[in-house]
Amino acid sequence: MKAKITLNISKLVVLFSLILLVSGCNTTSIQYDIPEPLVDETIYLSDPSSFNLTVIGGHLILPNAGHGGILIYRRYFDQEYYDFAAYELACPYHWNDGCGLLTSAMGDLYLTCGCNDHQYQALDGQSIDTAYVLPVKEFSCQFDGGNILRITN
């Protein structure tokens, strides 16, 4: 009887180990070559320079933050933290090249690399070409639901 209980416990341990191993296989960590800059920016939406962030699709560029600047994009108007996205404006593939800045025109839904015209979606930072696996580097946004937006890493 004792051997049977030990055998069942052994089977359970093996089963749980396999489940953990298999579930861990799908986790992928994005490795950027871009060094991690210190980012801690506070944006006040009531400031006239931030007016574009009061509408969905509006954006604001912080030229002296990150490596190539930071683009803040208004995705939604739910008064929640996920309303905004903040992206590094240095291309994940050409960040160290002079041409590697991402640009976007007001109302444009894409960020375009200056080196090869490759495009990324402004909504989520993903590449529109599956050959490019790295998305644009995204920073954390905290929004108080009213006037204050904080961008950090």
Regions found by a protein language model. Name each.
Residues 17:
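Conserved binding/recognition cores within well-folded domains
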Residues 20-24:
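C-terminal motif of bacterial Sec signal peptides marking the signal peptidase cleavage site
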Residues 91, 112-113:
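Short cysteine-rich clusters marking metal-coordination/redox-active sites
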Residues 108, 115, 123-129:
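Acidic, glycine-rich flexible loop segments
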